[in-house]
Amino acid sequence: MVVAKKSLGQHFLTDESFLDRIVNALPPLNPLKLVEIGVGLGDLTLKLLDRYPLKTYEIDSHLCEKMRSKLKAQKKPFKLELVEKDALFLKEEEPYFLISNLPYYIATRLVLNAFKDPKCRGLLVMTQKEVALKFCAKDSQNALSVLAHTIGNATLLFDVPPSAFSPPPKVFSSVFEVIKEPLKEKALASLAQAPFFEEALQKGFEMLEDFLKACFSSPRKTLSNNLKKSVSYREKLDKVLDFLALENQPTSVRASEIKDYLKLLNYLLKG
């Protein structure tokens, strides 16, 4: 019997109906490689291997050993490449699509890593419902939604109740997908001065992420007040006010009311 480790935030999805819904929600992958974070009890992994070759990152050596034993007992049409490694250090040389039931405590960081990785062309993941709602929120409601919609389209697919897991978490989970769009990535890469596109895209994402941290540092306060507290952006406050005037937005605007952060940051970088 496998005992979930609290230190790794393990809650294993065991409900067959939700496992099937996740697999069926995958978009057409050809020619993308499919990469999974976390093998868990192997239930999702085994279902994926009925349809696709798969590479899985798993930090728990005990779960890796259990998965190897299952594969010996169950022959699958496609092969699994099982990597015993922390997914925070995930690095692929070829374009891939990411799928995972992410541990709550590190889900946001792993999703942002995927956003930043030019080789990742999209993702289908499950997180705590509150986190999924932030990524999939429309317009500029929070920094995570701005980042998600700057690189592509984020869509909330369905909720998963605690009863679908072993052990059950205290909150609902949600499955969402983000499909990256090349034109949006090109606009983001234009923020940075770098000789290669992938390098420019990573740098542009980091620049926008840093700017959004300052803008949303106190969401209930005005954008101007937040930027006044920022060492990096307080000197550009006059340009921010100029931009707001050009966009016919009041100086009392909050961060969540800005319509186009990429346009604003481009304006600030011009001089």
UniProtKB/Swiss-Prot annotation:
It is found in: Cytoplasm. Its EC number is 2.1.1.182. Pfam families: RrnaAD. It is an enzyme of class 2 (transferase). CDD domains: AdoMet_MTases. GO terms for biological process: rRNA methylation. Keywords: Cytoplasm, Methyltransferase, RNA-binding, rRNA processing, S-adenosyl-L-methionine, Transferase. It catalyses: adenosine(1518)/adenosine(1519) in 16S rRNA + 4 S-adenosyl-L-methionine = N(6)-dimethyladenosine(1518)/N(6)-dimethyladenosine(1519) in 16S rRNA + 4 S-adenosyl-L-homocysteine + 4 H(+). Its main location: cytoplasm. GO terms for molecular function: 16S rRNA (adenine(1518)-N(6)/adenine(1519)-N(6))-dimethyltransferase activity; RNA binding; rRNA (adenine-N6,N6-)-dimethyltransferase activity. SUPFAM superfamilies: S-adenosyl-L-methionine-dependent methyltransferases (SSF53335). GO terms for cellular component: cytosol. Signal peptide: none annotated. SMART domains: rADc. S-adenosyl-L-methionine binds at H11, L13, G38, E58, D86, N101. It comes from the Bacteria. Specifically dimethylates two adjacent adenosines (A1518 and A1519) in the loop of a conserved hairpin near the 3'-end of 16S rRNA in the 30S particle. May play a critical role in biogenesis of 30S subunits. HAMAP family: 16SrRNA_methyltr_A. Belongs to the class I-like SAM-binding methyltransferase superfamily. rRNA adenine N(6)-methyltransferase family. RsmA subfamily. PANTHER family: DIMETHYLADENOSINE TRANSFERASE, DIMETHYLADENOSINE TRANSFERASE-RELATED. This is Ribosomal RNA small subunit methyltransferase A. The gene is rsmA.
